């Protein structure tokens, strides 16, 4: 039977020289070539698929103004700087005009400023005092809420933006957009929608609440300087419960929703909004939810 030459074949940029084969075997040659090429593609894809995913390590995104400080677990306090990596139980501080922005994981970020102090959990934070704004970047995973804790309440956000201000006299929560749930150690629960505010005036509380808070402060003071155990590496330390929480009720006040004019003004002058090189990721959502225009340049 006469033989025919098969034209040169291209495989991955290389040329296979012509080989004398029987006509009936031509299809077999092409099938083998296709199989080899396909196998190479599958092997390459499998290599890409099995690459392990690396979690984003917490880090400082920006420090537009000082004073700002960082204290890693077991280390002395140092000046905060952009790009610095952080660990669970790191203590962050700002004073006066100091401001910083921190990236946690899965799109969770926050800004703090003024006389503020905050401690990092693995994916949550504890605001010890001062002001902060926290959010989850649009499009990021919302499998778990971003929890911002204080000794008085925990704000849970899931694809939303919330502002907290915690002083010696009050705790104030402003939900900029979306839905925020606030839960207290005493079992009270509040849900805020876009523009709604919640406040706790510490001076107007009952004597029972004041005694409870003093006892809680005493417990916290005793814990200072004690390094966290290895078991505490993933989450913030549990809240102290000096009394049965069901017997202590705090008097919270739902404030009027923020007005359009007030919201517009705050977006234009707030250091936590305008005092950084870039706007927060959820600014357009805030403007849309509250019916606002873009802040003036």
Predicted stretch roles:
Residues 92-155, 173-182:
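Short, small-residue-rich packing micro-motifs
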Residues 55-71:
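Short N-terminal segments immediately surrounding and downstream of signal-peptide cleavage
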Residues 81-85, 89-91, 115, 195-197:
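Glycine-centered loop/turn motifs
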Residues 38-47:
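Bacterial N-terminal signal peptides
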Residues 72-88, 95-98, 159:
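N-terminal post-signal-peptidase region of extra-cytosolic proteins
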Residues 2, 6, 52-55, 77-81, ...:
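C-terminal interaction modules
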Residues 5, 19, 23-39:
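Bacterial N-terminal signal peptides that target proteins for export
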């Amino acid at each position: 039977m006469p033989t025919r030459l098969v034209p040169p074949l291209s495989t991955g940029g290389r040329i296979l020289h012509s080989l004398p084969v029987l006509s009936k075997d031509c299809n077999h040659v092409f099938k083998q070539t296709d199989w080899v090429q396909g196998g190479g593609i599958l092997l390459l894809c499998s290599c890409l698929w099995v690459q392990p995913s690396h979690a984003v390590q917490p880090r400082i995104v920006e420090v537009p103004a000082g004073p700002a400080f960082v204290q890693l677990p077991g280390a002395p306090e140092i000046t905060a700087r952009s790009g610095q990596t952080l660990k669970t139980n790191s203590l962050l501080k700002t004073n006066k005009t100091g401001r910083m922005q921190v990236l946690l994981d899965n799109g969770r970020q926050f800004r703090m400023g003024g006389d503020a102090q905050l401690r990092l959990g693995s994916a949550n934070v504890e605001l010890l005092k001062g002001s902060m704004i926290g959010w989850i970047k649009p499009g990021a995973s919302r499998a778990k809420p971003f929890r911002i804790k204080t000794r008085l309440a925990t704000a849970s956000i899931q694809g939303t933006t919330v502002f907290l201000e915690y002083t010696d006299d009050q705790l104030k929560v402003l939900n900029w957009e979306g839905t925020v749930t606030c839960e207290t150690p005493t079992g009270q629960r509040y849900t805020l929608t876009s523009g709604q505010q919640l406040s706790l005036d510490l001076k107007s509380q009952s004597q029972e609440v004041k005694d409870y808070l003093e006892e809680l402060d005493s417990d916290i003071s005793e814990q200072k300087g004690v390094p966290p155990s290895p078991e505490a590496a993933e989450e913030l330390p549990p809240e102290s419960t000096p009394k049965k929480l069901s017997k202590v009720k705090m008097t919270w006040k739902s404030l009027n929703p923020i007005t359009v004019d007030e919201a517009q003004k705050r977006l234009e002058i707030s250091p936590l909004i305008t005092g950084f090189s870039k706007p927060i990721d959820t600014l357009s959502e805030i403007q849309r939810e509250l019916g606002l225009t873009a802040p003036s340049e």
